[in-house]
Amino acid sequence: MKITNYEIYKLKKSGLTNQQILKVLEYGENVDQELLLGDIADISGCRNPAVFMERYFQIDDAHLSKEFQKFPSFSILDDCYPWDLSEIYDAPVLLFYKGNLDLLKFPKVAVVGSRACSKQGAKSVEKVIQGLENELVIVSGLAKGIDTAAHMAALQNGGKTIAVIGTGLDVFYPKANKRLQDYIGNDHLVLSEYGPGEQPLKFHFPARNRIIAGLCRGVIVAEAKMRSGSLITCERAMEEGRDVFAIPGSILDGLSDGCHHLIQEGAKLVTSGQDVLAEFEF
């Protein structure tokens, strides 16, 4: 079996996890012969090879191929795959996209934070992004709150932005951001490791966050509570060697307790875009 991007998608649809497919691809780099399906089952370490192979053979290739081709994609085997992303733990094997893939070539910074942000939190993000003077592509997750504020600030200041979503590219979540997602997909870039039609399941979003952080040289966080998803994303980013920039907030409402914790752990306190740019070498 030749491992093409379509075959990667088919392996996912047959039940292999991202990590299991990574094992197969890493093994395939070191051997010359094509792998049989039984080899893939063994190498991947899947729990029930018989069930996996049965699912694989039951797939209607004509239907799945049509689904796969609904949006362009690239895999970790392709030259356009970002090096920084390939270096993270559990790097996504396959990404669908809509928009301008050239944005992946430019320096990027991620922005994460609360979905239920305050007006002050949104304005703080807008101020920092405005101060970046379009030197960095803004990467975020198109969620409510801080994510939306980050994408909008980039657009309003004439910059570029990338949205990494936790659904298929033809699914809009939240629905209130449909127009924004369409706009970014037409003029900027939307990425997803989920195939067409895939819905917003809870576990998709922590997985999405690893891509947001992995694409970037640094992560800006605003209004992250303790034990929030944003805090976990930043802690993982620090483990991966990324810079973390925390915007401080009030000590009275608890909305920024996670940011303050990160500052204590070594994140850089930032109040302007210049604070962020000072850490980047161009």
From Swiss-Prot:
Subcellular location as annotated: Cytoplasm
Induction data: Expressed under conditions that induce DNA competence.
GO cellular component annotations of the record: cytoplasm
Xref: SUPFAM superfamilies: MCP/YpsA-like (SSF102405)
Transmembrane portions of the chain: none
Keyword Transferase attributed: no
Reported consequences of knocking out the gene: Loss of transformation. Imported DNA is very rapidly degraded.
Keywords: Competence, Cytoplasm, DNA-binding
Assembly with partners or alone: Homodimer; forms tail-to-tail dimers, forms nucleoprotein complex (NPC) which requires at least 30 nucleotides (nt) of ssDNA becoming optimal with 50 nt. Interacts with RecA, forms mixed DprA-RecA-ssDNA filaments. Interacts with ComFA and ComFC.
Domain notes per entry: The regions responsible for dimerization and for DprA-RecA interaction partially overlap, it is suggested that when RecA interacts with the DprA-ssDNA NPC it rearranges or disrupts the DprA dimer, leading to nucleation of RecA on ssDNA.
Family note: Belongs to the DprA/Smf family.
Biological function: Protein that helps load RecA onto ssDNA during transformation. Required for DNA transformation. Not required for DNA uptake but for a later stage of transformation. Thought to interact at the cell pole with newly imported transforming ssDNA which it binds cooperatively, protecting linear and circular ssDNA from nuclease action. Forms bridges between DNA segments. Favors the loading of RecA onto ssDNA and formation of RecA-DNA filaments, triggering RecA-catalysis of ATP-driven homologous DNA pairing.
The protein's name in its UniProt record: DNA processing protein DprA
Native organism: Streptococcus pneumoniae (strain ATCC BAA-255 / R6)
Gene name of the encoded protein: dprA
